[in-house]
């Protein structure tokens, strides 16, 4: 899946979409449809806050999201992930919101995360960013 799409989008194997498609092709449909897909910064934010919102940075750099426009539904349908389009990209967190870098996530640290980190419950958590651009 290392190719250039009709609208100039280039997908590389280290990006999330090829990995998600690989999983879809190897998992039972009833299991795949229950998955939530996160890039690492968003997963860490989820673990800290319990919120499934995603960062614009992760979605743009790793998940073929276009800021201001969202995802290209035709692209997802063409590659076999049409269910993402029909579910408003719920498995990618879009139905919960897309945040810019540093924007507050949820109500801050959950009690569990706060206890594990030795911090106060509700300590603000900002939307993350990826660690490199490739």
Model-derived segments and their meaning:
Residues 1-134:
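Glycine-rich phosphate-binding/catalytic subdomain of phosphoryl-transfer
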